[in-house]
Regions:
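Generic beta-sheet signal
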Residues: 40-42, 151-157
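Feature marks hydrolase-like catalytic cores characterized by long aromatic- and Gly/Pro-rich stretches
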Residues: 164-165
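A short, acidic, amphipathic alpha-helical segment used as a generic capping/interface helix at domain edges
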Residues: 137-147
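N-terminal secretory signal peptides that target proteins for export/translocation
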Residues: 1-8
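Active-site-proximal alpha-helix that buttresses catalytic centers in soluble enzyme cores
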Residues: 28-127, 133, 168-196
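A short, structured loop/turn motif at beta-sheet edges
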Residues: 146-149, 182-183
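Bacterial N-terminal signal peptides
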Residues: 12-23
Length: 196
């Protein structure tokens, strides 16, 4: 007599794999932000979602209505990042931001510390190559003077700045965590994915 076996459903196994993957992704995110809670770490964050590219030619720093700004998705991204950071123990960070409104708004919506404008975090898109290089050197010099044993520092900036410092190309609301080195330099230790 031929032995017949009933085919098993793959759904329970598939569900188990999906839940395990989700659990690992959540753990990795929490661990990543816990790095920032350790002394001598910096989060270099691209501003949250602001539809479009660049800014209009008549853009003025003092007038947000002339700039690209966060949309609802961007505001929700910034709030979600702030919640994740606070859950990892980052509650009293030094937060520096580009002067553009989309960065300032992202920094404020994180709600993890006092926000201060830092001009060297502003976009370099409209600068000449010598101006761009000078600004990046000034930002590197600022980072080199941060205390290696200090609390968390967050820089809210633009993709061009993150890329110039780390060769990373984060999506809006994404970034990298840097470890400050004793010699005044830094190294990239983790990527921060943008919240969905």
């Amino acid at each position: 007599m031929e032995h017949l076996t009933r085919p098993r459903s793959i759904w329970p196994a598939l569900l188990h794999c999906c839940l395990a993957s989700l659990s690992l992704a959540t753990a990795a995110t929490v661990d990543t932000f816990e790095l920032l809670a350790q002394p001598g770490h910096v989060l270099l964050l691209r501003h949250a979602n602001a539809p479009g590219v660049g800014d209009p030619p008549a853009m003025k720093l003092s007038d947000c209505s002339t700039q690209r700004n966060l949309d609802d998705v961007g505001r929700n991204q910034a709030k979600a990042l702030g919640e994740r950071l606070r859950a990892a123990g980052v509650t009293n960070a030094r937060v520096y931001t580009s002067e553009l409104c989309r960065c300032r708004d992202t920094a404020q919506l994180l709600n993890i510390g006092t926000v201060e404008a830092l001009p060297t975090l502003s976009s370099t898109v409209r600068l000449t190559e010598p101006e761009r290089l000078s600004q990046i050197r000034a930002l590197r010099a600022f980072i080199s003077k941060l205390p290696r044993d200090g609390g968390p520092v967050v820089f809210v900036t633009h993709q061009v700045i993150v890329t110039a410092l780390t060769d990373n190309h984060p999506d809006s609301g994404g970034g990298v965590i840097l470890r400050l080195l004793p010699n005044g330099g830094f190294e990239r230790v983790a990527e921060v994915p943008a919240p969905m």
